[in-house]
Amino acid sequence: LDSASYNGFQFYAHDKIKYRPKSLLNSIFIEPRQIYKDSARNLTRNHLKSLKNFKLVKLKYNELNSDELTASILLTPLKKYSIRLNTEAIHSNIKQLGFSGGFSFLNRNTFEGAEIFKLSFQGSIFDISNNTGSDDTPFNSWEVGTDASLEIPRFVFPFLSNKIIPKNMGPKTVFSLGTSFQKNIGLDKQKFTGIVELSWKSTPRKTHTIEMLNAQFVKNLNTNSYFSIYSSEFNRLKTIQEEYFPDKNISTSNALTFISDEINTAFKANHPEDYQTAKNIEKRYDILTLNNVSPSISYAFTYNTQFDFKDNDYFFFKAKVATSGNIASILAKTEKDGVKTFLDIPIAQFTRADVEFKKFWKTSSASVFAFRSFLGVAVPYGNSDEIPFSNSYFIGGSSDIRAWKTYDLGPGSSNTGLEFNVSNFKFINSLEYRFDINRSFKGALFIDAGNIWDITSSKLTTADEKFTGLKSLENIAVGTGFGIRYDFNFLVLRLDLGFKTYEPYLGNNKWFQNYNLQNSVLNIGINYPF
């Protein structure tokens, strides 16, 4: 039996005391020689559970005499180490078929202060539909990544004292590092991420999160294969070449040279639409192949009335503002063309703001109405003319507008037919009626509506891609459909079939023109879309 005394508290352990008393007291709100309060008891229990170090937290009170109590807190620790393995089958419009596997290692109470260290590895192999053609071997595409994080149940920076954020708000610091590498997936992206995050709860329903640093380094290793990978874009250029420049030769290796040499002011005067198509392809090349460093800071506020995961009648609101590159640009190197770089990589400067609202109504013991609305805007400035691809908005997919595949819709009323359509303004709403079929099988009827637009003054985007005011809301796409879900208790397997109901890029008649099984989209997802 081991024991210790600290600040009027006695600590006992069957073996050695493995938690620093000072660290545990950060989660204990029962004070010696103070009047008993239910609020202090509940706060203590909840905070100790939130440490994710104990499988059992039990509080006991015994009477000493008529006006005094002794309080005992019994803690049963979880195993210090845990290992988890996972496997997954993957299917999408980009990755036709794939398999992934992961391994994660968890170390609780890493430094005897209830910290949690997590190290994970993930690997995937895919059969890619838009392969470069250099290797036709099945499953020749892969992605590997590793992440490490340290969660500390307190603030570690001396300028953030308990006087600023008191311990009853559950202050937390998280450090994380991650990296991933791809082969034969798109442009073979290399990505490194480092995050320093602070969070606390001002009330049980209000959460504040500050990312003091979210640094992302993105490098594309296979930009020379761009037009082999994004073949639809090359085919559009090929059509322009064959119609207007039959004496010219164009290949995937000289497509950019063709644009710069032939798609000039004179061509624009005679063929404005095809000029715009070529320039859009050039712009998308710049966005998708851009190597960048994005050192951002952000603040997020979340208001959530959900009591626990079984609560189906609640309200959720989240607002987040992030800005990238401001401090780093001061310290950066300025090149001859005025571009500021770090390690010869341009620094991305932009501001992004997102607002999300969700409301759930429990209409009976076996049915729920769910509503979700999202609005997001990202504006480049200073060192950047475009938003990095990873910070841009897309539309479509299993958790978005389910009648369109990921990246297939927008911007606006345009219908580019190109891969990976992204932009800098997004608005989406979804309404879903969820009901039980039996104990495990669930059903759903849904309607999704939204789109992405361009809100910059760029001359390279067409009028049908831009958001110009309320009139642009006419270009909101609408999809409807139904879903079947199976509840495994620990996750929900979801099959949603979406039908194109209103297509903003069509002519005069935009309603129900492709409302059929042939043009529907089957979405396979894990858990609910929102």
Could you describe each region identified by the protein language model?
Residues 8-14, 28-35, 135-136, 343:
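Second-shell loop/turn segments in exported
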Residues 17-18, 37-318, 402-403, 492, ...:
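Gram-negative/organellar outer-membrane beta-barrel architecture
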Residues 31-37, 107, 463-469, 480, ...:
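C-terminal soluble interaction/assembly domains
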